[in-house]
Design a protein with these regions (language model features):
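Bacterial Sec-dependent N-terminal signal peptides
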Residues: 1-21
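Solvent-exposed N-terminal domain segments of exported/luminal and surface proteins
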Residues: 21-128
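Short, exposed beta-strand/loop patches in secreted or surface proteins that constitute
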Residues: 46, 53-55, 132-142, 201-202
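Extended, loop-rich substrate-binding clefts of extracytoplasmic carbohydrate-active enzymes
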Residues: 102-171
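A short, structured loop/turn motif at beta-sheet edges
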Residues: 137-143, 171-172, 182-189, 251-256
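Acidic (Asp/Glu-rich), glycine- and aromatic
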Residues: 163, 175-205
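Aromatic sugar-binding interfaces of carbohydrate-active proteins
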Residues: 195, 201-221
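Beta-strand-rich recognition/accessory modules
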Residues: 226-282
Length: 282
């Protein structure tokens, strides 16, 4: 009897822990959750639910835009409960946003957002323009949940490449792992980083980039300061460069890179000040 109760308790603990991630992917036309969306057209941004596959952990939700941008966007959360499958990224569409609800305060604009991916051709940024179709995937893993977006037939350096962006969320961590790959194994130069707006604090250190402050264009009645950060292996990238709206890093020639991203905000309980967010990286 004791052994049975112990086994049941262990199963319950596993279920609770595993419930701290979620994923979502669907066409707007039917709102049915699916594991994969395949499109012969490169840009179906406005036809896919929340504009692309989305994944959530206890501290944030992320989505990959289903278009040429390669951008990753952020949904900020005040509490550790799951919200993605209930609100589908937009709590205000279900009524007034409650005290415990998160919201879409992050503004990507025309950038790659937080840890999104583009390519670099030695002189300029190359967006993931899919000439041979685009695929999105979402599902569960042993440790949590994942989403993926694949752009097929991206014109690059006098040829074509197929680029995958995958985000893995582990139920035991507040960070998410971003993996970018060229599917045939061809070496390319990946571009990633963290976007920023006028008035935000920007800081860098050994293997990390951080940004703190409200986002220009956030329509909230009271601006919500956000934290956005990226960790990376310095030996894989050139030094951090600052443009007018992006703290970017460019990889050395490689068929695959991995980074970790994190987001926070003043509405959460842990990393809710700029000082705490900065200290997290030290």
């Amino acid at each position: 009897m004791k052994k049975t109760l112990f086994t049941a308790l262990c199963c319950l603990i596993y279920i609770v822990a595993d419930a701290q991630t979620a994923h979502s992917l669907f066409w707007k036309k039917d709102s049915l959750q699916v594991a994969e969306i395949v499109s012969k057209v490169g840009n179906q941004f406005n036809k896919v639910g929340h504009h692309g596959p989305a994944v959530e952990n206890s501290h944030m939700a992320l989505r990959i835009y289903f278009n040429d941008s390669g951008a990753i966007d952020v949904y900020s959360k005040p509490a550790k409960g799951m919200e993605l499958l209930e609100y589908l990224w937009y709590p205000h569409k279900k009524g007034p946003v409650g005290v415990g609800d998160g919201n879409d305060h992050y503004i990507v604009g025309k950038t790659i957002g937080l840890g999104g991916i583009a390519l670099w051709d030695c002189s300029k940024e190359v967006k993931l323009v899919a000439t041979k179709g685009r695929t999105a995937r979402a599902g569960a893993t042993k440790k949590g949940s994942y989403i993926e977006m694949i752009a097929y037939g991206v014109e690059y350096m006098s040829g074509f490449v197929d680029i995958s962006i995958r985000i893995d969320m582990d139920s035991r961590s507040r960070e998410a792992k971003v993996t970018a790959r060229e599917l045939s194994g061809r070496k390319v130069r990946f571009l990633t980083g963290v976007n920023f707006h006028d008035g935000q604090s920007v800081f860098t250190g050994k293997g990390y980039i951080g940004v703190w402050g409200p986002h220009k264009g956030d329509k909230s009645p009271v601006p919500v300061p956000l934290g956005a950060g990226l960790r990376f292996r310095q030996s894989d990238f050139t030094p951090v460069q600052k443009t007018e709206d992006l703290m970017r890093i460019i990889s050395k020639p490689s068929s695959k890179i991995t980074t970790s991203i994190i987001a926070s905000s003043v509405i959460e309980e842990e990393l809710n000040t700029e000082q705490l967010f900065r200290e997290y990286f030290k």
